[in-house]
Amino acid sequence: MYTVKQIKELIEKHSQDESYIHELVKDDKRKSAQKLIEKWHKEREKQQQLHAAWHEMLQFENNAKAQGYTCIAGIDEAGRGPLAGPVVAAAVILKDDTVLLGLNDSKQLSEKKRLAYYDLIQKEALDIGIGIVDAATIDEINIYEASRLAMVRAVEQLAHTPDYLLIDAMTLPLPIHQENIIKGDAKSASIAAGACIAKVTRDQMMEEYGRQYPEYQFEKHKGYGTKEHLAAIQTHGAAPIHRLSFAPVKSVIS
């Protein structure tokens, strides 16, 4: 009879071979051995659920491919709501065999997971484009148009020319077939990847602004209107990266 340690090692080695694992412990009555099997079953079920969820996240990409499109980009932005800093968009073209289990709406991910997916997407994606629109331009053309402009710039930064765009609740002035999806970052793998890249890119920019303007602590709130942020504006006035057209900033500095 194998020791529990040996069983654990064999389960890890043959984790995909269900019949082997059941045969391994079918006559083993030890609680410790049975617990290992229970753990394996739970992990296997979790992996199956993650694979099913990933397949579901590819439905829009697969539908586009079924219509004959071959280069599909998912686009999303980060930073529409903050009082300071740019709005950042990312366009991501995934390879056909890319698998990013667990990727979902980037706002629901912990910072640690988001950074891990960011690194994975950078490594696994066929192409990534980033578009940035600064606070002064946001004040000039409004945040909706600035978000659209950031998305257009992101597409223009791609080395590959997409023939189909999946966009989170937006239509872009581009001569490319496009589909806009409400809450797309929770429904489309490509959009979710774009959302993750945009969010991390913007967060990194805000951390740098935090070093440039330490009195505002941008690295903590990323430009959102927290109580501490509003108090800092009240004390120090607006920084060069504040959106002066946004009501909370306007009311504090007027």
Curated annotation (Swiss-Prot):
Residues 70-254 form the RNase H type-2 domain. Endonuclease that specifically degrades the RNA of RNA-DNA hybrids. InterPro entries: RNase_HII, RNase_HII/HIII, RNase_HII/HIII_dom, RNaseH-like_sf, RNaseH_sf. One of its GO terms (molecular function) is RNA binding. It comes from Bacillus pumilus (strain SAFR-032). It holds the Pfam family RNase_HII. A divalent metal cation binds at residues 76-77, 168. This is Ribonuclease HII. It comes from the Bacteria. Manganese or magnesium. Binds 1 divalent metal ion per monomer in the absence of substrate. May bind a second metal ion after substrate binding. It is found in: Cytoplasm. It is an enzyme of class 3 (hydrolase). The keyword Electron transport does not apply. Keywords: Cytoplasm, Endonuclease, Hydrolase, Manganese, Metal-binding, Nuclease. It catalyses: Endonucleolytic cleavage to 5'-phosphomonoester. GO terms for cellular component: cytoplasm; ribonuclease H2 complex. GO terms for biological process: DNA replication, removal of RNA primer; mismatch repair.
